[in-house]
């Protein structure tokens, strides 16, 4: 998942990359889940230990693990009650049906129980992200080295000759920024927390990832990386007074930042202008590249099916929200339907219901609480928690996808694994 899957560009260019990446996700994640289950069964059959009963498994799980299992169960109920059971199970245009959610949760829980985070995994991720960023730089220079764009087109034809922006072997630029929001915190925290001089090699993928994010300037990604850094630095401090001072400093920075945006954001343009307008109580559906419009239309659907939603990946079946743009080259009006809330938490609420969202948030918050307690002493906890935080901040503006979401679920699994090992065995370096 950290190498072949991440670098696999598909066989048909960006036009079909989501479908092909999803099939690769099923192969790798499904293979991991199946292989782990078979190995555990073999161990039981060869006398290496009996298979535990479901009740015993449940008792052995931590709070975060139980909440993830609950999130899956509530998603399954949502699928059973869905407005379209087939779409809810297999997935719609986003390929995030119950099948995909099952693999997210199963892989996360298995990693949290059996995974052993090794340093070479971080190096492998660093190499993969470096190659991805180098490809992105070539594309940003106007080249099409792998032929991922349609013939004769490049990155700068986005939203003119074709819909959307695409980069690297990830595809959609917003989804690429979600991966960067997990990668950048992981790399800089590792460079700070890991022992040995070799850790400084991680500054290479860190610099490349940061440069790509800055060049593309996806607002959600920028907020995710900055927000993660602000909240992570105090957590890494060992001294209690220093940590308290760090959090106080972060609070001051946030207050001053909001005050600055309120007072001067209107003069700066871009998303800072939009944020300033919102702080002044002026709402426009076009803000956030139309996200406010999508959020408003999505929120209108929530009361209809508050408890279990419409079913995973069914928003596109329930909303009439759409964007229209006139293509001067073709001389036609192009209409693009909305099939995601462009806010992962709102997306869960409308698709899987309020209980599923609460279970998901509770799983993240309980894992975060343990991260805060252990990150200063445990490098694995620090790295994985920072990656989860970066992803979760950008998720307020992002789209969950089987291309980027595995970064969250793997990091969350390793975070729970590292915390559980610390609690049982004491602090140790991995």
Predicted feature descriptions by range:
Residues 41-46, 418-427:
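Membrane-interface capping segments at transmembrane-helix boundaries
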Residues 172, 210, 299, 305-307, ...:
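A conserved mid-to-late transmembrane alpha helix and its immediate loop/hinge
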Residues 144-167, 271-289, 301, 312-350:
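Interfacial juxtamembrane loops and adjacent helix segments
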Residues 1-14, 32-102, 261:
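N-terminal hydrophobic segments of proteins, predominantly signal-anchor/transmembrane helices
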Residues 15-19, 89-93, 170-174, 216-224, ...:
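Membrane-interface catalytic loops of GT-C/OST-like multi-pass glycosylation enzymes that act
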Residues 13-26, 83-112, 266-287:
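Alpha-helical transmembrane segments and their immediate interhelical/interface regions
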Residues 4, 27-40, 69-80, 98-110, ...:
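Alpha-helical transmembrane segments of multi-pass inner-membrane proteins
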Residues 11-15, 137-149, 262-273, 307:
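Helix-to-loop transition at the C-terminal end of transmembrane segments
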């Amino acid at each position: 998942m950290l190498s072949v899957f991440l670098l696999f560009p598909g066989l048909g260019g960006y036009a079909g990359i989501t479908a092909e990446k999803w099939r690769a996700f099923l192969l790798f994640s499904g293979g991991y889940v199946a292989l782990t289950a078979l190995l555990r069964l073999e161990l039981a059959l060869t006398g290496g230990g009996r298979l535990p009963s479901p009740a015993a498994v449940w008792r052995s799980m931590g709070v975060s693990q139980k909440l993830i299992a609950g999130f899956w169960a509530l998603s399954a109920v949502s699928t059973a009650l869905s407005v379209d059971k087939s779409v809810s199970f297999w997935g719609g245009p986003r390929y995030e049906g119950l099948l995909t959610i099952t693999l997210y949760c199963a892989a996360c829980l298995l990693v949290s129980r059996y995974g052993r985070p090794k340093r070479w995994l971080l190096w492998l991720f660093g190499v993969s992200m470096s190659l991805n960023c180098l490809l992105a730089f070539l594309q940003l220079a106007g080249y099409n080295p792998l032929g991922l764009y349609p013939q004769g087109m490049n990155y700068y034809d986005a939203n003119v000759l074709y819909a959307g922006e695409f980069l690297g072997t990830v595809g959609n630029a917003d989804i690429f920024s979600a991966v960067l929001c997990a990668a950048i915190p992981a790399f800089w925290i590792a460079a700070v927390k890991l022992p040995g001089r070799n850790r400084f090699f991680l500054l290479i993928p860190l610099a490349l990832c940061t440069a790509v994010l800055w060049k593309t300037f996806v607002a959600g990604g920028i907020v995710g990386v900055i927000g993660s850094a602000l909240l992570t630095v105090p957590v890494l401090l060992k001294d209690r007074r220093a940590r308290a001072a760090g959090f106080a400093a972060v609070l001051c920075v946030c207050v001053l930042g909001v005050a600055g945006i309120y007072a001067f954001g209107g003069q700066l343009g871009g998303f800072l202008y939009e944020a300033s307008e919102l702080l002044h109580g002026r709402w426009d559906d076009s803000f956030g590249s139309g996200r406010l419009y999508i959020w408003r239309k999505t929120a209108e659907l929530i009361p209809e099916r508050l408890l279990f939603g419409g079913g995973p990946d069914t928003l596109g079946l329930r909303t009439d929200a759409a964007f229209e743009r006139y293509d001067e080259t073709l001389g036609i009006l192009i209409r693009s339907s909305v099939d995601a809330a462009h806010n992962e938490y709102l997306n869960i609420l409308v698709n899987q219901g309020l209980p599923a969202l609460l279970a998901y948030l509770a799983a993240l918050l309980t894992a975060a609480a343990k991260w805060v307690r252990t990150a200063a002493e445990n490098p694995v906890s620090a790295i994985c928690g920072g990656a989860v935080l970066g992803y979760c901040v950008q998720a307020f503006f992002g789209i969950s996808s089987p291309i980027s979401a595995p970064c969250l679920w793997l990091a969350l699994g390793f975070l729970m694994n590292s915390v559980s090992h610390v609690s049982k065995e004491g602090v140790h370096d991995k």
